[in-house]
Regions:
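Clamp-loader machinery-focused feature within the broader ASCE/P-loop NTPase space
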Residues: 17-156
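Conserved catalytic/switch belt of AAA+ P-loop NTPases
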Residues: 134, 159-170, 174
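Charged, glycine-rich active-site and insertion segments that engage polyanionic ligands
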Residues: 17-82, 170-172, 177-327
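Conserved Walker B
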Residues: 149-153, 168, 180
Length: 327
């Protein structure tokens, strides 16, 4: 299963050459992955390293298609990959833990769960990787595992993954990471590194056009996206989710203490922890473009550290906004 017969090698080479055509702005990654498939010399583990939203997830899907196809991939197989319900595919994301259950970011948002801290890849998730790869594949030649945000592993989970990488068997692991420097060096050394770069403006617009998502974006959102079409779409979503009255009040710094305290109260009542962290980034860009100077930027950066350090959010916002109202 999955091997290429000599008589079909020419067709296979041509098909693989077209496999990554929708991966825009990543020629180096495309060349490396295409060559690996054409020569049938896949590494046991890959590290797709680069910013969020520049095509790492799409590249992983296309590579999996190439692994499954053997020259031909049915629409049913492609749909199962996209829906992540192929029996030989395990796709992991960082999760939140609530009442003994694990929730991905999208599931936590749908369930209305409080998200004060970033999600993590849990030890039990990583242990499942080893069990998954140890079993006999159902349809494919090998078990396939994709781990998103691999840098979100605490030490115990990272050590468990390292043991799997030391004896990967016939499986294929793809780690996606926007911060590969946070991974154990021993994990990085056991993966073939594929770098993904930020896109130029023309490539960003080409991606958005293909997705039917072109529009005039505020300069602060474009700056936050920094060459990442996926990040731009996520920043749009976050911006559109903000209550309109809060956006209006954040156009300028608070002028009076009572105004600052009321804003802190309303922010904490309206936004969860992850939304508050996003808001700091957005407000910094907004104020910088309005010529607010360095002091508000430094104060908002300190606020971010306090929120990440488990300071009570409303208290952290009150102190920060009071400082900003008199600065």
């Amino acid at each position: 299963r999955g091997s290429v017969r000599p008589w079909s090698r020419c067709f296979w080479s041509s098909w693989v050459g077209d496999l990554f055509t929708d991966l825009i702005g990543q020629p180096l990654a495309v060349n490396l992955l295409t060559a690996a498939l054409q020569q049938q010399r896949l590494a046991p583990a890959y590290l797709f390293a680069g910013p969020e939203g520049v095509g790492r997830r799409l590249a992983a899907l296309r590579l999996l298609e190439g692994v499954l196809a053997g020259g031909v991939l049915s629409s049913r197989q492609r749909r199962r990959l996209l829906e992540r319900n192929h029996p030989d595919l395990l796709w992991l994301e960082p999760t939140y833990q609530h009442q003994g259950r694990l929730f991905t970011s999208s599931e936590a948002e749908e369930a209305g769960l409080s998200r004060r801290t970033p999600p993590q890849l849990r030890l039990e998730q990583i242990r499942n990787v080893s069990r998954f790869l140890a079993r006999q594949p159902v349809e494919a030649e090998r078990g396939m595992v994709v781990i998103e945000a691999a840098e979100a592993m605490p030490e115990a989970a990272a050590n468990a993954l390292l043991k799997t990488l030391e004896e990967p068997g016939h499986g294929l692991l793809i780690l996606l990471s926007a911060a590969p420097e946070r991974l154990l060096s021993t994990i990085r050394s056991r993966c073939q590194l594929i770098r993904f770069l930020r896109l130029g403006d023309a490539d960003v617009q080409q991606v958005l056009q293909r997705c039917g998502e072109q529009k005039d974006d505020p300069l602060e959102l474009l700056a936050m996206a920094a060459g990442s079409p996926g990040a731009l779409l996520e920043h749009r979503r976050q911006r559109e989710a903000l209550p309109v009255d809060l956006v209006d009040r954040l156009e300028t710094l608070p002028q009076e203490p009572m105004q600052a305290l009321a804003l802190a109260r309303d922010l904490c009542e309206s936004l969860d922890g992850q939304q508050q962290l996003w808001l700091i980034d957005w407000w910094q860009q907004k104020l910088w473009r309005c010529g607010a100077g360095h002091d508000p930027m430094h104060r908002l950066e300190a606020l971010r550290r306090h929120l990440l350090g488990f300071v009570q959010p409303r208290l952290a916002w009150e102190v920060a906004l009071l400082d900003l109202s008199v600065s």
